[in-house]
Design a protein with these regions (language model features):
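Serine-esterase "nucleophile elbow" of acetyl-processing enzymes
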Residues: 1-51, 63-71
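Gly/Ser/Thr-rich helix-start
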Residues: 13, 19, 50-53, 81, ...
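Alpha-helical cap/lid subdomain in secreted, periplasmic
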Residues: 33-41, 57-190
Length: 190
């Protein structure tokens, strides 16, 4: 077996996938490289981001995805923007969120749960701005869930507006900023 220090599964939607990045980059790529370079060890991240998906869709694929990477003891979870955009019931989204977290726990994976920055800035797509109200409710719930389940909360709510390329998706600098936030959470746990 190769000398790999850590493997981290990164699950989410287009924000995890890296949609809109001109070079196909994503926060998971940067996170793996930052961990490897900073600590002089081999870290691997696996990007399971699927554009357009919500918590319920992640639940359908989550268990199988995590089984495909048994060496990934940690999971970066960043989901919920599409739940808010598609105006899904907050209650139902949170049931699906908790079901995903139950799957992670059943497989013995530690979760870093990220909050949602919401929709900001000039040039934002024409999705309803009211989605930010739903995002605020999800973020409040995420904080409570992280506390109750002893997960590591990764707060992305204060993402600088210049890190958005279209009000929702991220610039390359935005992907690096998110990677740095997950990096800090991963290091804080050690």
């Amino acid at each position: 077996k190769s000398n790999v220090y850590g493997v981290i599964a990164c699950q989410g939607d287009s924000l995890t996938f890296g949609s809109r990045d001109p070079d196909g980059m994503s926060y998971p790529i940067y996170l793996g490289r930052m961990l490897s370079q900073k600590h002089g060890q081999t870290w691997a991240t696996v990007n399971f981001g699927v554009p357009g998906e919500c918590w319920a869709e992640l639940w359908r694929r989550n268990y199988h995805e995590l089984l495909s990477v048994p060496e990934a003891g940690e999971v970066c979870l960043w989901m919920g923007t599409n739940d808010a955009w598609k105006d899904r019931s907050i209650e139902q989204s949170l049931i699906a969120c908790e079901a995903v977290l139950d799957q992670c726990r059943a497989l013995g994976r530690f979760v870093y749960l990220a909050t949602l920055p919401g929709k900001r800035g000039f040039g934002a797509p024409r999705e309803p701005w009211k989605m930010n109200e739903a995002i605020e409710k999800l973020n409040v719930a995420y904080k409570k869930i992280a506390e109750e389940r002893r997960l590591q909360l990764v707060d992305l709510t204060d993402m600088p507006v210049e890190h958005f390329c279209d009000g929702i998706h991220l610039t390359q600098a935005g992907n690096k900023w998110v990677a740095e936030k997950f990096l800090a959470a991963i290091e804080a746990r050690r």
